[in-house]
């Protein structure tokens, strides 16, 4: 569950954690913005005197010790997050070299890398003691740390150079937990001695009728990284509001869409899903990115004022399903499959556990009309997507993710399964 400490008054943290715990989550995730923690410009690379990590440390301790939640941290240095500067401090512009043709931030320029290491050395050392590897057996702690963010969406040269520098900073600063990134092809099945130790994950922001893409894309991710967990870093939990633009509650991402993307991710073989946002919060004191409203309500499961939306109860139901069948689900095989009969808008698939338990997933892609009838599922016969798959970026634009033939989920062969269905719009 995504919940940012810097978007919520500390007096309300405990309530938000309680609600997340009651919804069945075992982990919370947060970005860690550089500009939030080093607001005053240092005198140079070796000056760490202006860092203040006291609030994030309190947030981590509350999550882990009071509520028994694992934690995931994502310190960027670029975080996007509809946040001021994408997490970069404004004072960093003073050190931007003149005469550069390309965008300096996120680049492989050695001066940018040096400042990124300045940040990573500090934040990793500050959080190292909160790692689960430093905790007594049975206690919770940080289980994952992310480097960079959605690097596929940024066109620049030498990405491997920056990623390797960040990896080295994490390890040299005492962090020994697994390192991951998201939507960063340079780390998928890499043969580099360091980047091969970083697993990639996916972000799913899909159209109203495109929830099945989550199943295909997760199956593809598992195929590309067979030894890594299938993790959705950001599973669409809503959308942000824009000044003079559409508000969060006007977005199509309703409770039905929320449920569909969750179940379809599980069909594809997800081993972890992080709803972004599960609680959105507020942009205090102008910390939102340009064009963002003060509210970061996100039409999330837990609203800005702490109320529970319909999405909350869908999340709770999915959590109960996962808790009931976790051992079977996490070791199951399968995915989307061909079907005989059934409505045109019906999509489905099967996952089979080691003990023979079969999980059938069905979804109605028609947002207007309910469907009912009978269908025969044919596990082992792949039902491939008819069109290319897209993600929706922060500008509302479609970004091509994978060609239609990319996913391969023909991993099980069991007898056909006959199912009667009655699915709402």
For the regions a language model picked out, list residue spans one by one.
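Mature N-terminal segment immediately following signal peptide/propeptide cleavage
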Residues: 1-3
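Short, acidic/polar
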Residues: 6-22, 187-189, 255-263
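A generic structural signal for short coil/turn motifs at secondary-structure boundaries
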Residues: 8-9, 38-40, 46, 152-157, ...
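Aromatic-lined substrate-binding rim segments of carbohydrate-active enzymes
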Residues: 12-85, 167-172
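Hydrophobic residues within beta-strands of alpha/beta enzymes
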Residues: 28, 179, 200, 273-274
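Aromatic- and acidic-residue-enriched carbohydrate-binding clefts of CAZyme catalytic domains
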Residues: 31, 36-52, 81-111, 289-305
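Substrate-binding/catalytic cleft of secreted carbohydrate-active enzymes
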Residues: 73, 77-115, 121-268
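Carbohydrate-binding surfaces of carbohydrate-active enzymes
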Residues: 113-131, 138-147, 152, 159-170, ...
């Amino acid at each position: 569950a995504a919940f940012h400490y810097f978007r919520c008054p500390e007096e309300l943290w405990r309530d938000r954690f309680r609600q997340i715990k009651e919804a069945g989550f075992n982990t919370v995730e947060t970005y860690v913005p550089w500009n939030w923690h080093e607001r005053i410009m240092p005198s140079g690379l070796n000056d760490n005197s202006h860092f203040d990590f006291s609030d994030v440390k309190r947030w981590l301790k509350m999550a882990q010790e009071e509520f028994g939640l694992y934690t995931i941290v994502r310190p960027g240095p670029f975080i996007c997050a509809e946040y001021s500067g994408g997490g970069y401090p404004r004072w960093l512009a003073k050190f931007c070299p003149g005469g550069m043709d390309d965008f300096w931030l996120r680049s492989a320029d050695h001066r940018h890398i040096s400042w990124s290491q300045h940040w990573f050395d500090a934040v990793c050392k500050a959080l190292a003691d909160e790692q689960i590897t430093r905790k007594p057996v049975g206690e919770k702690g940080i289980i994952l740390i992310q480097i960079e963010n959605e690097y596929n969406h940024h066109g620049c040269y030498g990405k491997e150079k920056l990623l390797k520098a960040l990896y080295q900073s994490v390890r040299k600063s005492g962090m020994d937990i697994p390192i991951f990134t998201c939507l960063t092809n340079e780390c998928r099945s890499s043969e580099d001695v360091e980047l091969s130790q970083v697993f990639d994950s996916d972000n799913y922001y899909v159209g109203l009728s495109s929830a099945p893409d989550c199943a295909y894309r997760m199956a593809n991710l598992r195929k590309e990284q067979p030894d890594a967990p299938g993790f959705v870093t950001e599973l669409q939990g809503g959308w942000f509001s824009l000044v003079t633009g559409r508000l969060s509650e006007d977005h199509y991402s309703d409770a039905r869409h929320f449920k569909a993307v969750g179940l379809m991710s599980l069909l594809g073989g997800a081993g972890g899903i992080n709803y972004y946002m599960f609680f959105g919060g507020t942009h205090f004191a102008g910390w939102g990115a340009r064009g963002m409203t003060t509210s970061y309500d996100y039409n999330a499961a837990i609203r800005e004022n702490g109320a529970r939306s319909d999405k909350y109860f869908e999340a709770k139901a999915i959590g109960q399903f996962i808790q009931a069948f976790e051992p079977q689900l996490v070791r199951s095989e399968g995915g989307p499959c061909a079907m005989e009969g059934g409505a045109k808008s019906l999509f489905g698939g099967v996952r089979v556990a080691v003990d023979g338990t079969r999980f059938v997933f069905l979804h109605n892609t028609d947002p207007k009309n309910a469907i009912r009838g009978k269908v025969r599922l044919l596990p082992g016969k792949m039902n491939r997507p008819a069109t290319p798959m897209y993600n929706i970026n922060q500008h509302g634009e479609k970004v091509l993710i994978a060609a239609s033939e990319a996913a391969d989920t023909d991993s099980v062969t069991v007898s056909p399964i006959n199912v009667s269905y009655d699915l709402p719009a």
